[in-house]
Amino acid sequence: MAPVSPTDFPQQCHGAVVGLGGNIGPVLDNLQGAIAELALVAGIEVERCSSWYRSRAFGPPQPDYINGCVTLRVSLSPPELLQTLLAIEQKFGRIRLEKWGPRTLDLDLIFYGDRQLEQARLTIPHPQMQYRPFVLVPLAEIAPDWVDPRSGKTIIQLIEQVDCTAVWPVAPGLELGGSLEPEQVFAPGAVAVHG
């Protein structure tokens, strides 16, 4: 695919999906804090948040992950949105040492409207999302009819193709309505998840 620059995307709103996850530290506090940070960014409106789900980690032995998804309305370009996500990860102590290693916070840009994009640092839709029940299960909760532009399949159709038995709900999602204030989202220690 041809390189894309931020100027290739006009300043209009697009739907986007971000997957959130983590498995070390105060995971739910970090996930909810990340949503609060997203809500503070000009050009981002948080629309819906899924419930939180526990799943086994890939890679080396490590704690289970807690994952969820949010739908957004954004006027940022895909590269700008990616930079925002990386900055929020850093703010919550994300250190990139090993692939599939433990992390305080992981934010993945899953969809950006119906766009397909392939760059060195960004591929949209996320190249592995259709194989990941920890993405598909929460996404089916909040956007079951979202269509993967690569396959033409809805999230519901994609979820039927993966084994979801190792994904368990652990906490309700955030109730979002009207304009989102950070204090509505982030109440440290408000929800505890026990092993």
UniProtKB/Swiss-Prot annotation:
Keyword annotations from UniProtKB, A to Z: ATP-binding, Folate biosynthesis, Kinase, Nucleotide-binding, Transferase
The enzyme's E.C. designation: 2.7.6.3
Keyword Nucleotide-binding: yes
Molecular function (Gene Ontology), one example: 2-amino-4-hydroxy-6-hydroxymethyldihydropteridine diphosphokinase activity
PROSITE patterns per UniProt: HPPK
Pathway where it operates: Cofactor biosynthesis; tetrahydrofolate biosynthesis; 2-amino-4-hydroxy-6-hydroxymethyl-7,8-dihydropteridine diphosphate from 7,8-dihydroneopterin triphosphate: step 4/4
SUPFAM superfamilies membership: 6-hydroxymethyl-7,8-dihydropterin pyrophosphokinase, HPPK
Entries under InterPro entries matching the protein: Hppk, Hppk_sf
Xref: Pfam families: HPPK
Single GO biological process annotation from the record: folic acid biosynthetic process
CDD domains in the record: HPPK
Catalytic activity, reaction form: 6-hydroxymethyl-7,8-dihydropterin + ATP = (7,8-dihydropterin-6-yl)methyl diphosphate + AMP + H(+)
Annotated function: Catalyzes the transfer of pyrophosphate from adenosine triphosphate (ATP) to 6-hydroxymethyl-7,8-dihydropterin, an enzymatic step in folate biosynthesis pathway.
NCBIfam families: folK
Family membership: Belongs to the HPPK family.
Name of this protein: 2-amino-4-hydroxy-6-hydroxymethyldihydropteridine pyrophosphokinase
Protein source organism: Synechocystis sp. (strain ATCC 27184 / PCC 6803 / Kazusa)
